[in-house]
Structures are given as structure tokens and as C-alpha cells.
């Protein structure tokens, strides 16, 4: 809220306010459809969701538990049936992501581990809801990533812990094991609907390159998800006021009302929202985060210079409504008008835009 307040203050008071949009291609809000595959029947059910998503041009993220140990929680469902499902998800354009090995309710209290954990020697065992034996943070991350990449044929760069258990060592553990993005907390707990950068040990002294993408709505609260379509759309409408992130978590343990919720929700927002995977949005956000903007102005003209160290598509610039483009460098750069300004379709390393005020 404080950052949004300062942004609005800047836009109201600055003589030449220019800000970067928070949604690719100037859409009203970004929507991430994410699934936690952590139950015996969820693997098969995931395909029903995936086929629907592909049919409407939506790519989703499937956070998949690699459960190869039978224990208190469930049978060992990551077996010979899993690889064909993973490969079909990948073929449909979806992202494969890690949801740990054990899905332990006490993952936040696991020791960090050695960084040498590997399959099949790593054998975490959930004995009760509050007791897991043989688990470590690095083991959960290393082994799940290895198996998903081995059988899914896709690099795994996004992570979500079971039960959103969030150990203090998670940011540096993500770095150490090759992940780039996290979706491990709710928006309510983190008090923001925007991505944010994680700090070492979740403290204040050192940033990591990992960004967190908090969960907005999940399917385990009451009333049942199928009865919450309008409530979810109401949240989306509020987030669209400032380009906040809508990260929807749906467990594919059943289809029924959950799948119908997704159908109705996606259909309603498709005309105004940007949909993509966690990796797609996170890659875009990290590139946007490094863009530098410099504004010069006179009585009748303004010049905006952008420096973009990383490849970036669909960057929206929010500009005063009376500005009109006079010239562009490099020549031929494709600009598209948007509701709040304009969109640069493909951002080169350096851009200079001249406007008449």
C-alpha cells in the first residue's frame, strides 16, 4: 500500500511522470493459473485441467510432488504412471514445477541439509502430521527438481512447498539448487498482491535474485471453489485497478466444481487479463525490474530514455494523457497505444522516445 501511495503521489505531483506497467502488454492484470499436484488421483485429473487450458490458449503451472515413498500422507504415486502425464503437460505448453518430495506439514522446520542429497538414497518419511524423518530443505528441492526434469523433459525453475511451509533458509536454498522463482506464501500473509524480491534468511541485510509470486486465491477455504466465481472476479477487478497479480491455486484432486470454476473464471477474464505460467511472468518481471528510465522535459517536449539489460517484450509505459510521440530511436520500434500510455512490443537494450507535451 505504501509503495502504491508513493507511486500515485509521484504521478499526481511530478511535472513529467513516467512509470513502468506491472502487466505484460498493458493488459489490466496478470493471471497465473497454478495447480498443486499432491494426491494420488491428482496426476490423472491434472490432464482434464491441462486440456481445457490448452483449448483456450492458457498456459498453467503444475507444481508436482514427486512422492516415491509410501507413508502417512499417501501412497507412492510418483511411479510409472507419472512420466506420460508430465510429458503430456509439457506437450500442451504448461510449466512443470516442484512441489517437494514429502509434502510435509513441518517442512519449515527441516534442517537445511548437506546439498548432496540424491535419489534414491533420499528417503523422507512422514510418520505423523507433525513428524517427518530424514527430510531436509535441500533434499526436498534437489531431488524433486532432478526427477521432474528427468521424466518431464523440461527445466524446472519454479518451486512451491507443500502447505506453503516457508523455512527461513528457503531463499538461499532456492539459489543453491537452481530455482529462479518461488510461490510459497499468500498475498494476505505477505501484505501485497505484487511480486517481491526475497532476502537471504528472509531477513533485511542481503537480497537474492529470487522473486516471490504470492498466492491470491486457493481452493481449500470455504465455501467450495465452485461457489466463489463472483468473489474471485471481484478480487480480480480490484487488482486490475493497479495491475496487481492474480495467482490462483487449484488442487486437481477432483474435477467437478473446481474445473467449472476455472472455466468460468478464465472465460470472464480472458478479454482483459494476461495469462501465463509462473516462469513466463517471473522472467518478464525480473527483466522489467532491471529497466532504468530517465526523463528529461521542457515546456513543450519530453524525452524518455530506457535501458533494458535483459530481453523484454510487452513493456507498458504509463504516461501523461496529453503526451504524443514525436520520434523514436531506434527507428522502426513498434509501439502500441494502451489505456494508460503505450506498449513497447520488443524492448531493445536502449530506447529513446521523444514526446510533445
Predicted regions and their residues:
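Catalytic grooves of carbohydrate-active enzymes
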Residues: 150, 210-281
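His/Asp/Glu-enriched short active-site or ligand-binding loop at hydrolase and phosphoryl-transfer sites
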Residues: 175-204, 212-222, 275-285
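Surface-exposed beta-strand/loop patches in extracellular or lumenal glycoproteins
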Residues: 307-324
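Short acidic, Gly/Ser-rich segments with clustered Asp/Glu that frequently serve as metal-coordination loops
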Residues: 38-44
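C-terminal beta-strand-rich structural cap/linker in extracellular carbohydrate-active enzymes
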Residues: 313, 338-357
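Metal-dependent polysaccharide deacetylase catalytic core of the NodB/CE4 family, i.e.
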Residues: 30, 43, 50-169, 185-193, ...
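N-terminal pre-catalytic segment of deacetylase/amide-hydrolase enzymes
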Residues: 1-32
Amino acid at each position: 500500500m505504501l509503495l502504491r501511495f508513493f507511486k500515485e503521489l509521484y504521478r499526481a505531483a511530478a511535472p513529467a511522470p513516467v512509470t513502468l506497467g506491472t502487466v505484460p502488454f498493458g493488459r489490466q492484470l496478470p493471471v497465473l493459473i497454478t495447480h498443486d499436484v499432491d494426491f494420488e488421483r491428482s496426476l490423472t485429473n491434472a490432464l482434464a485441467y491441462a486440456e481445457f487450458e490448452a483449448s483456450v490458449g492458457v498456459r498453467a503451472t503444475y507444481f508436482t510432488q514427486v512422492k516415491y515413498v509410501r507413508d502417512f500422507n499417501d501412497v507412492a504415486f510418483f511411479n510409472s504412471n507419472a512420466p506420460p502425464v508430465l510429458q503430456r503437460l509439457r506437450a500442451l505448453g504448461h510449466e512443470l514445477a516442484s512441489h517437494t518430495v514429502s509434502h510435509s506439514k513441518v517442512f519449515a522446520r527441516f534442517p537445511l541439509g548437506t546439498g548432496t542429497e540424491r535419489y534414491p538414497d533420499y528417503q523422507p518419511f512422514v510418520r505423523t502430521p507433525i513428524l517427518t524423518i530424514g527430510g531436509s530443505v535441500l533434499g526436498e528441492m534437489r531431488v524433486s527438481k532432478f526427477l521432474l526434469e528427468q521424466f518431464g523433459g523440461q527445466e524446472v525453475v519454479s518451486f512451491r512447498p507443500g502447505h506453503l511451509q516457508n523455512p527461513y533458509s528457503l531463499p538461499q536454498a532456492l539459489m543453491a539448487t537452481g530455482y529462479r522463482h518461488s510461490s510459497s506464501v499468500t498475498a494476505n500473509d505477505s501484505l501485497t498482491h505484487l511480486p517481491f524480491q526475497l532476502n537471504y534468511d528472509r531477513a533485511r541485510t542481503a537480497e537474492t535474485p529470487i522473486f516471490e509470486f504470492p498466492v491470491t486465491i486457493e481452493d481449500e477455504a470455504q465455501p467450495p471453489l465452485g461457489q466463489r466465481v463472483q468473489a474471485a472476479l471481484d478480487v480480480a477487478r480490484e487488482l486490475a485497478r493497479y495491475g496487481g497479480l492474480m495467482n490462483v491455486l487449484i488442487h486437481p484432486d477432483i474435477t467437478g466444481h473446481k474445473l467449472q470454476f476455472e472455466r468460468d473464471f478464465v472465460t470472464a477474464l480472458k478479454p482483459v487479463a494476461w495469462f501465463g505460467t509462473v516462469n513466463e511472468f517471473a522472467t518478464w518481471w525480473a527483466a522489467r525490474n532491471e529497466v532504468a528510465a530517465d526523463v528529461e522535459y521542457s515546456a513543450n517536449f519530453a524525452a524518455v530514455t530506457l535501458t533494458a539489460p535483459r530481453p523484454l517484450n510487452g513493456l507498458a509505459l504509463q504516461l501523461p494523457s496529453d503526451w504524443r510521440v514525436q520520434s523514436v530511436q531506434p527507428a522502426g520500434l513498434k509501439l502500441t497505444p494502451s489505456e494508460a500510455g503505450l506498449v513497447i512490443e520488443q524492448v531493445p537494450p536502449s530506447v529513446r522516445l521523444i514526446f510533445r507535451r
